[in-house]
Amino acid sequence: MSKECDGKMLFNIKSLMLPLDSITEFGDECYAHLSEDETQKETLTEHTRRCQKYWFNIVEAKHIETVFIKFEQLYMGDITNEARHIFELMSVNVVTLHDIGKINPLFQKLKMKNSWKVEYVPESISSRHSIVSAIFYLDYFLDIINTAKGDGRINRDESDVLKDFAYIYSYIISRHHSDMNNLEYFFSGLTGKNTEGDNSGKDAYDWYEMFKQELYKEPVVKLRKRDEWLNRMAYQSNEKNIYLYAWTRLLYSLLVAADYYATSEFMNGYENNDYGNVNNIDNIINEYENNDVQKSIRNYEKNIKRLDEEQLAKVNKDTVIGNIKGINVLRTEMFLETEYNLKNNIDSKIFYLEAPTGSGKSNTAFNLSFQLLKKSDYCKKIFYVYPFNTLVEQNMNSMEKIFGQKQDIMSNIAVVNSITPYKVKNSSN
């Protein structure tokens, strides 16, 4: 559960993560991956632990627990501690159950070269595992929700909301090897009413029901009606739906990234510790401050008294103050004023800078970004979002002039748009 720490609520993520053997006894009998030469096998338990490790590392490196807490406050509102605990347990363990469907005997036989429980080979879902994992997840957590409601530990409204998340999270799991296309499409497939004929969710449910009944003599939790969930979402505010959309995308991204890193570790023997954060900020700032423009600005800051509004209004192309001339006086004044205002409002979340073209906004933005990285424990990366590719090119050229000789800095700068190839680090990095 979340806990109080120095006045802040924190997800205790590691205590929420379930060991795979608490969910299935088959984690060491079934395999998740084979090496390319098929001489090494990674058990499902080993892969799950790696995924959990990377999931936790990403959350910790990027301080995503603050997003968890904020979403829980804004979306879940005032709920009981038990409902909160179940929500957190469900959220954290998307990564734990995302590949549990690999116990599909046909996946084991065809993909892992492992003849395991071949008497339970499914006929209709082939060797697929993601949709089977989604059904496992649904059954596991719907049972927990129903039990808590039956015991009176959560109320009906809390049960309904938690079930919404169980379906959303199972959808995320079902799509972790593909894109996020359509939740309603997934829901229709679960109930066997998909108009396009893709009822793999229902087929996976039927196989899982047989598998669980044969092995454990236990029933599978019945799925809710499709329209019940959709109608409730339709009456939810747009604001809450935006929160939910962003939350769903975040958990999907976390799962895909953790799965990728974990799989790469097994396949390549490389344990990743680089999550794209800017860790050498002092080196970047030092290099930035050593360029001629910055030296001129800092010299002005040190030796010239700041201009008041009346003096600023009189600045023209012939104005010379110290070693700075014309419009560069205004650029310097804006640079220093924005830096001063930022430092005095460093805990604010949104800043707005408006100035005409040619006034030095790009250089000012560089400086403000670096100041934020330097002052904040939570800022780990800078995104510049531009309306036109020409502006991207201009600002990339500016950065190359400043950092072009420093490969350790330039290697961490990438352009992402429709005309620039993805940046790939070489093997030495």
Identify the residue ranges that each predicted region occupies.
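Acidic/His-rich, divalent-metal-binding segments that scaffold phosphate/diphosphate chemistry
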Residues: M1-V121
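Walker A/P-loop
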Residues: I346-F370
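An active-site-proximal "capping" alpha-helix that borders the catalytic cofactor pocket
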Residues: E46-V59, S127-D143
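Inter-Walker segment of RecA-like/P-loop motor cores
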Residues: Q405-N429
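Acidic/histidine metal-binding catalytic segments
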Residues: I64-N93, D143-H177, I409-N412
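Conserved pre-motif I regulatory segment
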Residues: A313-E354
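N-terminal accessory nucleic-acid engagement/regulatory domains that precede
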Residues: M1-A32, K53, A148-V320
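Conserved Walker A/P-loop ATP-binding site and its immediately adjacent core
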Residues: C379-G404, V415-T420
